[in-house]
Amino acid sequence: MGKSPKAADQGDTGAGGKKTKGEDGFSFGIDAEEVEPTGSDFSNDMPTPFDNFVGQDEQSNRAELPESGQPATTLALPAGGAGSGAGRKSPQKMQRAGMRRAAGAGAPKQQSDPDKLSDALLSAGVDIKEEEALLSSTVTTMKSNSQVSNSQIPLHPPFLHPSHVASMMKKVAAEQNFNQDFSKSSELLSLMSTACELYIRDIITNSIIISRHRRKAVKLNSGRRSETTRVLRDLALKQREQEERRVKRRIALGLEKEITDTKLDSGETLHRASNATANMMIAGGKKKYSWLTSGSKVNATDLKNPGKVSSAVAARGDLGIKFREAREEPGIVMRDLLHALENRRVGVNNTIAKGYARIRD
């Protein structure tokens, strides 16, 4: 029968268990004589970290587990027994076992402080107390700086006087059966003053914008848009020129006298006078004007008098075409304010009605 490669390799090794090389020059390990694999040996002869706690249990009846400890195990021992395995242990392994026991004995002393055990940041070298002290000092410094800056900023004066606002609010609240003294509510008075300021500012801003648009010249479509309007305007100009020539001819012949002192009232003046008279009559005034009652009849001799203007010319008055330049008031006028108030929906109905009643061109 042929030999197995394992038996051949064992034959090449020496009796002393030295390393051997095969035919290809590779090392296969160390062969020991009379060594057989056995199970783990957890005998009591081996020193363990728990041996240090025997004396402590008797004194304080309290045992603390070590932070780190590993039981010494022997996975492969010679067939001679546990005593021969312990005797063959190298000095380096014995030294390591002693260091482990020392570490296990010193661990409870280091972990006895609860403050150090509860703080995980202590192992990283962070001092919590020092950090808290630094944070509190920073907050105190920021508060002091903010107080200094606030004291240096001047107070903004209110738009409306607080006492006047409080009296007005009290009056309006009394109308709604709600009695309260608002003079002590400084924050509420400041809020109402700011709201009034914003309301009036908005109205004035809109009025300024409307005034600028009103005075701005329109450059596009400045010519006449309708041919009919142009023809009617030319006819009116010719008729006015003819009427002026006729009046001049009659004045030259002595039929009419040129008006110098007497001024004919325009339609606007008559309208204002009639309104003033109507207001006086409504108010209960006793004064009456002759032109409101049936006046005396005009004598025929007055019309024949050449020194007076004829009734036709007097009746004509300023009727006809009026030439005037386009006149726009500078700044903000009443119609600009009314236009700005028309965009409001609450509390402006009476104001708009009074404004249109007083507006005058």
Swiss-Prot record:
Primary location class: nucleus
Keyword field: Nucleus, Transcription, Transcription regulation
Known role: Functions as a component of the DNA-binding general transcription factor complex TFIID. Binding of TFIID to a promoter (with or without TATA element) is the initial step in pre-initiation complex (PIC) formation. TFIID plays a key role in the regulation of gene expression by RNA polymerase II through different activities such as transcription activator interaction, core promoter recognition and selectivity, TFIIA and TFIIB interaction, chromatin modification (histone acetylation by TAF1), facilitation of DNA opening and initiation of transcription.
Family per record: Belongs to the TAF4 family.
Example GO biological process: transcription initiation at RNA polymerase II promoter
The Histone-fold domain, residue ranges: 166-234
Compositionally biased tracts (Low complexity): 96-107
Gene Ontology molecular functions: chromatin binding; DNA binding; RNA polymerase II-specific DNA-binding transcription factor binding
Compartments in which it is found: Nucleus
Ranges for region Disordered: 1-117
Subunit structure and binding partners: The 1.2 MDa TFIID complex is composed of TATA binding protein (TBP) and the 14 TBP-associated factors.
Family matches, as PANTHER family: TRANSCRIPTION INITIATION FACTOR TFIID SUBUNIT 4 (PTHR15138:SF14)
Name assigned to this protein: Transcription initiation factor TFIID subunit 4
Gene Ontology CC: one annotated term: transcription factor TFIID complex
Species for this entry: Eremothecium gossypii (strain ATCC 10895 / CBS 109.51 / FGSC 9923 / NRRL Y-1056) (Yeast)
This protein's record includes keyword Nucleotide-binding: no
Keyword Transcription regulation appears in the UniProt entry: yes
